[in-house]
């Protein structure tokens, strides 16, 4: 197919005159294979008219000053810490570039730590992993003694493609290697320093009982001895509470693994807003821990009311039903038949429940529902919409609904709007709507007075 150049924006015949490009060099004209005949010296080019530094930035001197400043920083660093100076970086065709020689200070020493607390001898934490090349492959030496800061976590030549290793890359390498060796993720030889009889101080063991699930998992990754203590102590896993930020990451396999540490002695299981947990996982967990007394699944969208009833029926048929408290906030599709069956399985007396239960106040900012709620069942029928949800009371003493002797202000969050901060009902009162579409009553919307010194 022929190409049509009839509308091209440039001339079909190139000029025989030389042209000057931006770096100041002259480029010979194209002569279609003929010998260079040169151009007319009297020709005027647009670049000849323009000034070399139109904005007065003094680019050449500034560029030289920055290069010298980087070299001074490198010299000061080497003199202060006694490090040998890295070779200059070779770029492209092998010409030595002074700018990149100054920048080598940042590339070669960016991931090194001072010798005050994170190095062994004269070697850096990474065991001399950097070879001074900007685009080369960095090699990690094998662990031999104290020179390797990884504590033998890398095997073979430990090659890692890239200019340097970031903190996240180091964690990833350690995680994969320790997983293959069956060790604790993030542990090192400094924790047990070769002693087989390393143990945890009894005081630390008492402190572990006051930690939550996320903190226990963090402690178990410190060293091998703490990992063994946390995993083998069944008393630490009798009450398992999963909320933010673990709720978004925990899977069914992880939950089964955590509950197995209780060895059948778990008494309380609360998983808040865990979107990956299903009915089948909950049934398997309860089947292995039949002594459970409290079950809370608020906000777990993949758990259904039919799954909860199936778990309770199985426990009752086996004669092992000991569940006395259920938290089902956010569970959809609860009908009157479901609610009556729950009342029957939990053996709840409605008259006693109405007299001794504590009032519940609305507080949207509460990230994790409290486990101290002594209600046998957290949901109940809303007096207004007749749906089974969380029903809130009004904390305000001057509420109009309380003065009339009725419970007009007692309902779910959809039927009655409530203050985001204090939880009082907003009925015929002034309120302020926030940018996030939450409401504040007239009292909470007032700015707090500043203390005068």
Curated annotation (Swiss-Prot):
Protein's UniProt name: F-box protein SKIP14
CC per GO annotation: cytosol; nucleus
Keyword Nucleus: no
Role this protein plays: Component of SCF(ASK-cullin-F-box) E3 ubiquitin ligase complexes, which may mediate the ubiquitination and subsequent proteasomal degradation of target proteins.
Domain notes: The F-box is necessary for the interaction with ASK proteins.
Domain F-box, residue spans: 34-104
Gene for this chain: SKIP14
Pfam family, one: F-box-like
Entry keyword set: Ubl conjugation pathway
Pathway: Protein modification; protein ubiquitination
GO biological process entries: negative regulation of abscisic acid-activated signaling pathway; protein ubiquitination
Signal peptide region: none
Subunit composition and interactions: Part of a SCF (ASK-cullin-F-box) protein ligase complex. Interacts with CUL1, SKP1A/ASK1 and SPK1B/ASK2.
InterPro entries given in the database record: F-box-like_dom_sf, F-box_dom, F-box_LRR-repeat, LRR_dom_sf
């Amino acid at each position: 197919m022929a190409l049509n150049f009839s509308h091209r924006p440039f001339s079909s015949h190139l000029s025989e005159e030389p042209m000057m490009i931006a770096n100041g060099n002259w480029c010979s004209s194209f002569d279609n294979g003929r010998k260079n005949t040169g151009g007319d010296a009297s020709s005027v080019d647009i670049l000849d008219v323009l000034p070399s530094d139109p904005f007065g930035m003094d680019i050449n001197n500034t560029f030289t000053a920055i290069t010298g400043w980087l070299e001074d920083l490198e010299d000061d660093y080497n003199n202060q810490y006694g490090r040998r100076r890295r070779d200059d970086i070779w770029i492209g065709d092998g010409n030595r570039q002074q700018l990149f020689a100054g920048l080598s200070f940042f590339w070669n020493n960016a991931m090194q730590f001072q010798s005050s607390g994170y190095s062994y001898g004269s070697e850096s934490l990474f065991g001399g992993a950097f070879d001074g090349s900007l685009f080369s492959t960095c090699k990690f030496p094998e662990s031999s003694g104290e020179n390797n800061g990884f504590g033998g976590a890398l095997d073979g030549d430990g090659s890692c493609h890239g200019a340097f290793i970031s903190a996240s890359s180091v964690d990833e390498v350690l995680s994969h290697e320790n997983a293959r060796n069956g060790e604790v993720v993030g542990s090192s030889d400094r924790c047990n320093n070769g002693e087989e009889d390393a143990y945890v101080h009894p005081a630390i063991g008492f402190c572990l009982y006051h930690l939550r699930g996320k903190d226990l998992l963090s402690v178990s990754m410190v060293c091998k001895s703490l990992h063994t203590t946390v995993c083998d102590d069944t008393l630490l896993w009798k009450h398992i509470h999963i909320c933010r930020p673990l709720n978004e990451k925990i899977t069914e396999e992880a939950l089964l693994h955590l509950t197995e540490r209780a060895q059948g002695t778990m008494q309380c299981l609360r998983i808040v807003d865990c979107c990956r947990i299903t009915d089948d996982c909950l049934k398997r967990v309860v089947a292995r821990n039949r002594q459970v007394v409290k079950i809370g699944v608020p906000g777990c969208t993949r758990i259904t009311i039919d799954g909860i009833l199936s778990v309770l029926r199985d426990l009752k048929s086996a004669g092992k039903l000991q569940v006395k408290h259920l938290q089902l906030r956010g569970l959809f599709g609860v009908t009157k038949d479901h609610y009556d069956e729950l009342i029957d399985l939990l053996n709840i007396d409605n008259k006693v429940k109405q007299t001794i239960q504590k009032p519940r106040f609305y507080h949207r900012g509460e990230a994790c529902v409290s486990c101290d709620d002594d209600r046998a069942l957290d949901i109940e029928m809303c007096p207004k919409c007749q749906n089974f949800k969380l029903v809130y009371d009004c904390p305000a003493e001057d509420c109009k609904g309380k003065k009339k002797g009725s419970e007009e202000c007692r309902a779910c969050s959809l039927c009655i709007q409530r203050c985001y901060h204090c939880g009082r009902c907003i009925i015929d009162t002034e309120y302020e709507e926030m940018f996030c579409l939450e409401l504040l009553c007239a009292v909470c919307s007032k700015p707090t007075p500043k203390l005068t010194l």
